[in-house]
């Protein structure tokens, strides 16, 4: 797995050529055989659906739990039985251990599969399952405890001869002690929650001056996510690779990583699926233990695709006391696999998560070498309370180039409306020459920022504007014909009348650029088109479509091109091989009103979420860059800072704990007299 990180987990496109399975050896534990006829999945979304699919294949009945926000979720419909466990906030539902155990007993479930996240690495929950004689599908409590507390795991790994990074892993947690240890280690410093994971409770302090602020932010986020704000400090290795066992490594390094992973597992008496992660120096290939995820890994489909295994089936069999189906020596690696996490997020705004309704969701069709792991469908909500993942696209190829080429082809099949996604970013990333060559590290995104976030060329922008304009007119005409009330351009030869417009100019906004497209009717399916005052072009155009959506085919100067189209509110969505573009039409064309423009004097929430803290009061003087308030969204903390010097004129009528929408004004500033 290659993590491409910018600060926290922002966007991950994960690849693995091979990975030593976490049960690389069979522990000689005296495990009694137990029948599992029914399993409760203590999770939601795509991982709950993934576990259910294998359980059903094995003839095991499945039980879902769900919050109020998930009552119509896919995993609820997929399960044989489903039980509500509380309100939307995870602390009152998916993290409520007693409610989940009550459901397990009520449903007569012999086992609980925790998935990943939530309670998957919770020691107390594992202990409670054991005390209730319910099988926890995961490692022993002792292994979760030892590996879950990062300071403890570092000490154990050091004793086991597994290399670790220079740092502080002690119990004393006073601010003064942590500041002193940071100075001893030297900057830049990585600040990490001892119970953390997934980038939560993790910050980088590049200098001593920003250490305290980053420490406090990491502690708050850790307390919210894991109920523990203890921290460890590590030397920050610049531009490392974050590795398990994967592509771009020599066989010697791969073997050394595998042996270190086995030593790590043996040191804590590990049983079950897990993943040992390392930090690797790009030049020397020296590596250091980072952490062990004591659960099924998010990227486990990569391992399954290149080994032909079903790791969830293995988990269920091992939990029932059966031996592993294969030994390490029997596992054969073949080919290369790529996993893309498709997220509702805005890459151009620091990968801020987005929440709302998926008005349109078309995904690639699963096939032999293509998997789409998802837990949402069209018309459903992506909630502010949970991770904004829409799907995991997993593609296999004979080698890296083939796998990436197939990945780009499948990514281009996505059609999403209602929420911004990272699909366009993933397309650019997976086609980036340095990425294709395997020159990947944790600073890859900022290093290649210009290429990864570049605007489309003028020619591509013009082609998309043309498609949006003609598509808008043809779809409008088609709908009007169906409604027997034709308006505007009419493409039907028998319906065309002299009093109808032969020419129409449409105003569009693409990527914040205002454009005008003039379309002149010639005859059926033929037009003359001018984009932004440029040369007139002869265009042949026609619509087609099926259950997967409307398609527009145009021919310009002998070049034939087909794109997907969707009309949603005042937007025309254009889907092509480079991703998705949204063309906005004037609001007056649809609702008779214009969009409001937010005041530049206000500080607004960058994302839907919950207001965590307001850091200023009315009348306070503030300087540019000063933190004003904190929003929690999708389990991550976002600090909103002032963009100017000024004075706090007023605060919105919201308080910590209140929900806020994207763009909601929280602090109003005015110039200092």
Feature names for model-found ranges:
Residues 1-36, 459-490, 672-673:
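Eukaryotic N-terminal low-complexity, Ser/Thr- and Lys/Arg-rich leader segments
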């Amino acid at each position: 797995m290659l993590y491409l990180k910018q600060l926290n987990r922002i966007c991950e496109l994960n690849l693995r050529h091979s990975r030593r399975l976490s049960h690389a050896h069979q522990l000689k534990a005296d495990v009694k055989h137990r029948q599992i006829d029914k399993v409760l999945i203590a999770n939601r979304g795509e991982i709950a659906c993934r576990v259910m699919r294998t359980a059903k294949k094995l003839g095991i009945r499945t039980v879902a739990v769900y919050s109020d926000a998930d009552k119509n979720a896919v995993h609820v419909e997929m399960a044989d039985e489903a039980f509500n466990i509380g309100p939307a906030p995870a602390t009152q539902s998916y993290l409520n251990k007693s409610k989940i155990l009550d459901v397990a007993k009520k449903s007569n479930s012999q086992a609980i599969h925790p998935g990943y996240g939530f309670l998957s690495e919770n020691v107390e929950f594992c202990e409670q399952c054991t005390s209730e004689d319910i099988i926890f599908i995961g490692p022993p409590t002792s292994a979760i405890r030892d590996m879950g507390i990062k300071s403890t795991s570092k000490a154990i790994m050091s004793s086991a001869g597994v290399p670790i990074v220079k740092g502080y892993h002690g119990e004393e947690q006073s601010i003064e002690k942590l500041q002193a240890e940071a100075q001893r280690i030297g900057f830049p410093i990585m600040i990490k929650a001892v119970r953390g994971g997934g980038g939560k409770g993790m910050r980088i302090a590049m200098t001593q001056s920003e250490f305290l602020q980053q420490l406090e932010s990491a502690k708050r986020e850790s307390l919210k996510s894991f109920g523990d704000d203890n921290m460890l400090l590590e030397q920050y290795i610049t531009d490392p690779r974050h590795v398990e066992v994967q592509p771009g490594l020599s066989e010697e390094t791969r073997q050394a990583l595998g042996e270190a992973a086995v030593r790590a597992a043996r040191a804590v008496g590990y049983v079950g699926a897990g993943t040992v992660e390392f930090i690797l120096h790009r030049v020397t290939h020296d590596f250091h233990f980072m952490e062990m995820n004591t659960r099924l890994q998010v990227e486990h489909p990569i391992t399954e695709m290149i080994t032909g295994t079903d790791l969830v089936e293995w988990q269920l069999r091992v939990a029932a006391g059966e031996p592993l189906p294969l030994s390490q020596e029997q596992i054969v690696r073949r080919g290369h696999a790529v996993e893309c996490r498709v997220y509702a997020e805005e890459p151009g705004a620091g990968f801020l998560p987005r929440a709302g309704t998926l008005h349109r969701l078309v995904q690639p069709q699963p096939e032999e070498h293509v998997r789409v792991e998802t837990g949402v469908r069209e018309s459903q909500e992506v909630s502010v309370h949970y991770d904004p993942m829409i799907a995991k696209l997993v593609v296999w190829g004979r080698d890296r180039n083939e796998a990436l080429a197939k990945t780009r082809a499948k990514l281009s099949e996505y059609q999403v409306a209602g929420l911004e996604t990272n699909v366009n970013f993933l397309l650019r990333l997976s086609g980036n020459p340095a990425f294709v060559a395997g020159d990947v590290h944790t600073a890859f995104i900022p290093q290649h920022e210009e290429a990864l976030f570049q605007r489309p060329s003028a020619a591509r922008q013009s082609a998309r504007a043309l498609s949006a304009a003609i598509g808008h007119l043809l779809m409008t005409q088609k709908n009007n014909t169906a409604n027997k009330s034709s308006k505007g351009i009419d493409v039907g030869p028998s319906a065309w009348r002299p009093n109808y417009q032969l020419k129409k100019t449409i105003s569009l906004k693409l990527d914040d650029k205002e454009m005008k497209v003039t379309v002149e009717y010639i005859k059926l399916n033929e037009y003359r088109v001018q984009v932004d005052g440029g040369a007139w072009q002869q265009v042949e155009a026609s619509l087609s479509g099926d259950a997967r959506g409307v398609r527009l085919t145009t021919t310009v100067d002998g070049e034939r091109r087909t794109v997907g189209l969707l009309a949603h509110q005042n937007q025309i969505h254009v889907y092509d091989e480079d991703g998705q573009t949204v063309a906005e039409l004037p609001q007056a064309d649809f609702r008779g009103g214009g969009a409001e423009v937010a005041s530049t004097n206000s500080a607004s929430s960058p994302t839907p979420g919950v207001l965590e803290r307001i850091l200023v009061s009315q009348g306070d003087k503030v300087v540019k860059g000063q933190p004003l308030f904190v929003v929690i969204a999708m389990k991550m903390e976002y600090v909103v800072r002032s963009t100017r010097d000024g004075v706090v004129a007023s605060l919105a009528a919201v308080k910590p704990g209140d929900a806020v929408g994207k763009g909601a004004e929280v602090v109003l500033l005015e110039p200092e007299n």
